[in-house]
Structure formats: structure tokens, C-alpha cells
Amino acid sequence: MASEGRLYEVSFDADGCGATKAATAAVAEMIDGAPVLDAALIDIDTVDAAIGGLTPAKRHAAQLATDALHRALQGVASSSLSLIPPSQSGGVATSPAADGCHAPQHRVAVAMSGGVDSAVAALLAREEGAEVVGVTVKLWTDPETDGAKACCSPEAVLGARALAHQLGIPHFTLDLEEDFRRRVVDRFIGGYTAGTTPNPCILCNGEVRLAAMIDLAERVGAERLLTGHYARIVVDGVGPLLAAAADKAKDQSYMLAALPPELLGRLGFPLTELTKPEVREIAARHGLAVARKAESQDLCFLAGQGKRGFLRRHGGLRERDGAIVDSAGRTLGRHRGHHDFTVGQRRGIGVSAPEALYVLATDATANTVTVGTRAELEKRSVRVRDVVLHRDGSAVDAVKLRYRSRALPATVSAAGKGRHPSLDVDLGEAFPGVAPGQTAVLMAGEQIVGHGTIAA
């Protein structure tokens, strides 16, 4: 039981060898009456030392006891309870800090994924004198995925916890699987079912994980949540806005575009001015094993498996014969399901032609895929739905239509700050591959002033 930041009436049910029972008993004794933050610091070595040292063959007992403790702490963290004594309650800051700086001895929470970026964010915060608390979210469990490649899998949680303890900081896990399934995965499946190409990472960042971690940051008495994203926060006369990071090759502001402005004041990005090679060098200099860890290229719930298999298993989208047609409706070939294709796709279409063909559109109802030339693919205007503008539409001078694409010169139809059912975005140059379902990020220079979902 947790109350006023401490653990009480602690007990463990342990089956197995004597070492396992001794390890769990030691954990129960250590944490009964202890502050929750102290319990979150306990790792395998702590348990090992508490029972006088285990032989290598018995060290698994300390692992089992530690895992049981942190599963229990996950339940506490995933509740609405405050995890600190009332005297320490301060809450997160409401003023933005682009670099995540803070006064010495201030407490910050750091979102830790188990990768090098978040590890260095935590390291930099600690070196600046902050009391750091690590937070990891568990979003998806699927035996068919490669947990080692997923950022929010049970395996990633263990890796993040080990990194936090290596840095000497407490660690908590938030279980958001149910919310993630409902608000992200189900909409991902629904998008492909309807013939669009959704962007689940923007949904997750904007609606699920960061808000939950900011809430936990407040409950552990942290002034703000720091993350390892490459992005910047700037402040104008109205308030905070997202902007591009110094490392344009790694800039992740597009993926954060759906964050409400009120959350930006509670976030910090310590890597704003750093490049990826610099981050890896910092990690290597401090002996972190993740310094050379490869980056995941998959969506967290697709790691190690293909999109087709995932949609079949979780969305019931199975192979269904359909026609590949040109813009005049002539049949050029066959396919096995419209959901295997996205607008702008060139490879894997399965149709031979004198010049390269691209996917122009998919029709879920007719189960057809329309292909054509690059010239047919190009667009000079885009209809965007469910638009949120943080500034007046007249401020928009560019738009980004895909994560890895550059921002294009653009203007929007007259619109004031706020929400709009739809807006037309006129492009200053033709863009090939405007995919319905993707996010259109509206920009003023390098600042993000709005976003919406591409409709056509």
C-alpha cells in the first residue's frame, strides 16, 4: 500500500528456492515504510548485497525479487496517487524551458526509452545538479514482435530501468497498454481499413504517452518532464511553440506537432543543440552501453514484423484480390489488398510499364489501387481536416507533409487561431506523394503553428 509517498504493509508471496524467498523477504523489509522514490532505486545489486551476496548460479533470485518490486511500483505509478510526501508537493513548472535547465537540487522526470538519446538527456540533467527520476511507458506486448527493437515493449522497459539504475536514479514504469490500443493502434488499423496512411507516432505523442508522463512527473514532485527528442521550444508574445532542433537530420518536431501548447511549458529538450554523433560521444565517454545502440526504424508495435502480418492478426485485414488500374480505369494488374499500398509508393507495385509508376490512390470500398506517373502524382494544393491553429493562419508560410520530407512554401485559406473542420493549403511548389491520413504540419519559419490530417 502507498500513502503520502511511502510504502506500507508490504508483503510478497514467493515460491521457489531458498534464495528466491530470501531475496523477496529482503526487498519487503527494505521498502516497508520507505519512501516510494527510494524503493524505485532498488536494483539487483541492492538486493544481492542485502542478503550477503549470491553465487552466480543464484543471482537470478535477486532478479526475480527486483522484477516483482518494480511490477508493484508500476501499479502505484499507473494510479492517481501522489508518490511524494505532502510537504514535497510542488508540481511541474508552467513556464517553458527549451533546454530543460533548472536550478540545482530541483527534481525533474526524464522519459527513458532504453535508447541513447533519453539516457543522455537523463545524464545531462543529473550533471546540471538535478535530482532525476526516470519514467518509461509500456505500450505494447505482442509475442510476434521483436521486443528488443521496440521502444516501449517489456524488454525496452527492462533496458530503461537498468540504464536508470546505472545512472543512480529511481525508475518508474507506466502501463498505458489499454489506452495505447484504443487511441493509437485501433485508429491505425481503422485508417488502413479505410484506405488511408495514418501516423500513429504523432497520435501517441500528442494524446497518450507524454501527457501521462507529465502527470507522473507532477506526482513525483518534478518541475518538468525532459525527453530525448531533438526539438526546440520557443516563446513568442502569445506563448510556447515547437520549433526545429539544431540537428536538422534528426529533428523530431514533426512527430511532436500534436502536443497541446499547454503541455509545452511542462517539457524540456536537453538535446536541442546537440547532434546525434555528439550524443553518442557523450554516452560513450560515460561508459553507457547504449552509446552504439542501433536506432529502431519500425513503429513500436510493428518491430520485427511486417505491416501486412500485423493488420491481418490484429485488424482482420486479410488478402483480398483486387485490380490495379490507371487513372483512366484500365486494369494493369492485380493486388492482394488495398491496405498493402500507400500514396506515393513506387516499389512493390507489381506492374511493368515503360516508365516508373507510383500509387496515386487507394479505394477501400472497391479494393482498387490506382497508379500513374510522377507527374500525375504531384499536387499543388492539399485539403487538411481536423485542423488546429496555434496562431492566425496568415502566419503560415510553409508546410511539412511527411516526417522525412523538407518543409514546402505554403499558404492557407484565411483562418483564425483555433480549431477548423478543414482548410486548403496551397503549395508554393509541386509535391509528389500527398498521402491521405498523414499529418500536415503548418509552420511559420521553423516554428510549428498548427497541424491537421491530410484529407486529399
Segments from the language model and where they lie:
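Domain-level signature for proteins that mediate thiol-based redox and metal-cofactor handling
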Residues: 1-83, 90, 94, 98-108
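Generic secondary-structure signature for well-ordered alpha-helical cores
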Residues: 32, 36, 52, 56, ...
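ATP-dependent adenylation/nucleotidyltransferase module used to activate substrates
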Residues: 93-257, 277-278, 284
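Generic structural signal for well-ordered, non-membrane alpha-helical segments
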Residues: 16, 20, 40, 58-62, ...
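AMP-forming adenylation/ATP pyrophosphatase catalytic core
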Residues: 113-116, 226-233, 238-456
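Conserved short-loop catalytic and cofactor-binding motifs
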Residues: 11, 15, 53, 148, ...
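Generic structural signal for well-ordered alpha-helical scaffold segments
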Residues: 2, 73, 214-218, 312
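Alpha-helical scaffold segments in soluble metabolic enzymes
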Residues: 26-29, 64-71, 212, 278-285, ...
